[in-house]
């Protein structure tokens, strides 16, 4: 619960910080190489829709874990979070999020990040996307020390709802988890 409150506090602090910047030059103090990154994040935060995330499943790859280990893992990765997202001028999706969920050992794992998806429209209401997410998370097995990560991300959009998935790579007995989550744009 503390981690969820921490994630929500970070979002509120970012909101206050974004509001304090002038809209004409929100990224003026950034180096020129990173200004486009700052500008896209700022645009997502200020123009994006509010999102509610929910998670519920983490599949551990049966080819990399022993059956008795699989039985000991939690695959009901219940959790949720908040975010902001938008489709840009090219129709691609950008999202900022803060979530917390139960990890494989039933410990709360928070994550804060940015995701980008190159999308293709199937029809007016359905889009499919493929991209990545960069994030900061912490885990009990790493002494709750925050660490960065980058993961592949796929999604299927239907009107205001989204089903997304990422694969956490690893080695035999570590990682190799398909994590599935959903999003509703409010």
From Swiss-Prot:
Protein localization: Cell outer membrane
BP terms from Gene Ontology: lipid A biosynthetic process; symbiont-mediated evasion of recognition by host antimicrobial peptide
EC number(s) reported in the record: 2.3.1.251
Keyword Membrane in record: yes
Keywords, ordered alphabetically: Acyltransferase, Cell outer membrane, Membrane, Signal, Transferase, Virulence
InterPro entries the UniProt entry points to: LipidA_acyl_PagP (IPR009746), OMP/PagP_b-brl (IPR011250)
Site positions for Role in lipopolysaccharide recognition: 69
Signal peptide (UniProt feature, chain positions): 1-19
Protein name per the record: Lipid A acyltransferase PagP
Gene Ontology cellular component terms for the protein in this record: cell outer membrane
Species name: Legionella pneumophila
GO molecular function (one): O-palmitoyltransferase activity
Coiled-coil intervals: none
Protein purpose: Transfers a fatty acid residue from the sn-1 position of a phospholipid to the N-linked hydroxyfatty acid chain on the proximal unit of lipid A or its precursors. Confers resistance to cationic antimicrobial peptides (CAMPs). Promotes the ability of L.pneumophila to replicate and/or survive in macrophages. Important for ability to kill macrophages and to promote the virulence.
Cited HAMAP family: PagP_transferase
Homology family: Belongs to the lipid A palmitoyltransferase family.
Transmembrane intervals: none
Phenotype of the disrupted gene, per the record: Mutant is impaired in stationary-phase survival in low-Mg(2+) medium and shows decreased resistance to different structural classes of CAMPs compared to the wild type. Mutations reduce both the numbers of bacteria recovered during intracellular infection and their cytopathic capacity for U937 macrophages. The mutant is also more defective for lung colonization of A/J mice.
Active site: 60, 103-104
Catalytic reaction(s) noted: a lipid A + a 1,2-diacyl-sn-glycero-3-phosphocholine = a hepta-acyl lipid A + a 2-acyl-sn-glycero-3-phosphocholine; a lipid IVA + a 1,2-diacyl-sn-glycero-3-phosphocholine = a lipid IVB + a 2-acyl-sn-glycero-3-phosphocholine; a lipid IIA + a 1,2-diacyl-sn-glycero-3-phosphocholine = a lipid IIB + a 2-acyl-sn-glycero-3-phosphocholine
């Amino acid at each position: 619960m503390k981690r969820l409150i921490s994630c929500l506090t970070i979002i509120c602090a970012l909101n206050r910080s974004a509001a304090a910047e002038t809209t004409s030059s929100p990224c003026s103090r950034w180096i020129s190489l990173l200004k486009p990154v700052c500008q896209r994040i700022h645009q997502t935060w200020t123009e994006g829709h509010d999102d509610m995330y929910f998670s519920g499943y983490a599949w551990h790859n049966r080819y990399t874990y022993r059956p008795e280990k699989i039985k000991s893992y939690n695959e009901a990765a219940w959790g949720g979070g908040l975010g902001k997202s938008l489709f840009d001028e090219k129709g691609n999706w950008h999202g900022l999020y803060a979530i917390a969920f139960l990890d494989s050992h039933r410990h709360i794992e928070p994550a804060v990040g940015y995701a980008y998806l190159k999308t293709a429209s199937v029809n007016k209401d359905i889009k499919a996307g493929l991209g990545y997410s960069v994030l900061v998370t912490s885990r009990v097995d790493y002494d709750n020390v925050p660490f960065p990560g980058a993961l592949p991300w796929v999604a299927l959009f239907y009107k205001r709802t989204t089903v997304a998935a990422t694969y956490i790579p690893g080695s035999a007995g570590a990682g190799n988890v398909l994590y599935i989550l959903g999003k509703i744009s409010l």
